[in-house]
């Protein structure tokens, strides 16, 4: 970070860094964005304010002795007995929560070939962890790709701006047609395999997740990990993964211009694909997850779209359609 700041200043950018500076309020005015802090700083109005808050820390009062609304609401410091532990979410945050519980009841051991095993403590035989999400799908491992990103050939700034200028009606569908052409250009074989030409904004996400939904999530994670590690060794980029990663940053520019109907369609479809792609997680997290599976400790439950969560004093109960 400091190196980047230094490089920016060398190129005549004015960069100010305020450490331990808490933003207490934001006010949007006709002149710009006014920011209030807990430090005695000169009042300043900004043309653009980027809010990068990171994790949202829930109200500590929501946490109980048996319920933690996030890994950062006391779970990391709590003593969790060897019991039936349910974790909402299969993203990296959910896996972090699982690891925080697991290391209280054993240890991870890695051999020379990067294979990880989990050694459970003798007194922790009753430990059982269930990861729960609507789909039960696990994130994939970080994949190899060139950085800085290579430019897109079809979904360019000029092409997107031209579509935006045509108006919000049909904007999402027009841009999706550009996306299809970009993906076909990058990876014609994969495009043919998923029948890309037959898909639309609403069905693309279904095709993206279809094969993973049919497979055991742990088996898929193991296969994906092997592929990712092989690609890293060989400096091989998977074209369709890489083009989706680059498309995400480009396509997000149209989101403020979508009408309400298309905004909902985008959130249900393309947004989920983009999130799944860029939210890939470190290989080490996958290895530890698989180690817990091999130890018979961790399981995954797909909740479906309709479920209820009842938080009681002694336990939390989830009710699903089944």
Place the predicted regions along the sequence by residue.
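Flavin (primarily FAD) cofactor-binding/catalytic cores of flavoenzymes
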Residues: 1-322
């Amino acid at each position: 970070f400091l190196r980047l700041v230094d490089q920016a200043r060398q190129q005549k950018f004015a960069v100010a860094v305020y450490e331990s500076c808490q933003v207490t309020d934001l006010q949007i005015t006709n002149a710009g964005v006014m920011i209030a802090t807990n430090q005695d700083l000169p009042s300043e109005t900004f043309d653009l304010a980027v809010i990068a808050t990171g994790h949202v820390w829930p109200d500590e009062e929501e946490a109980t002795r048996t319920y933690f609304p996030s890994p950062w609401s006391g779970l990391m410091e709590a003593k969790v007995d060897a019991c039936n532990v349910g974790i909402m979410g299969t993203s990296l945050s959910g896996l972090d929560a699982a690891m925080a519980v697991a290391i209280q009841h054993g240890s991870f051991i890695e051999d020379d070939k990067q294979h990880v095993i989990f050694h459970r403590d003798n007194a922790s035989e009753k430990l059982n962890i269930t990861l729960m999400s609507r789909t039960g799908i696990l994130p994939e491992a970080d994949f190899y790709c060139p950085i800085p990103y290579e430019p897109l050939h079809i979904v360019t700034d000029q092409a997107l701006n031209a579509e935006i200028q045509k108006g919000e009606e049909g904007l999402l569908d027009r841009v999706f047609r550009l996306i299809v052409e970009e993906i076909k250009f990058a990876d014609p074989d994969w495009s043919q395999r998923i029948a890309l030409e037959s898909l639309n904004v609403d069905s693309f996400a279904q095709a993206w997740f279809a094969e993973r939904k049919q497979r055991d999530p742990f088996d898929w994670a193991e296969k994906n990990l092997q592929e990712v590690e092989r690609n890293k060794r060989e400096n091989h980029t998977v074209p369709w993964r890489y083009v989706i990663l680059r498309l995400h940053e480009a396509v997000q520019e149209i989101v403020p211009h979508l009408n309400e109907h298309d905004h909902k369609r985008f959130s249900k479809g393309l947004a989920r694909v983009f999130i799944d792609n860029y939210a890939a997680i470190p290989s080490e997290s996958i290895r530890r997850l698989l180690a817990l599976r091999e130890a018979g400790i961790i399981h995954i439950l797909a909740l479906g779209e309709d479920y209820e969560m009842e938080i009681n004093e002694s336990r939390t109960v989830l009710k699903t359609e089944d």
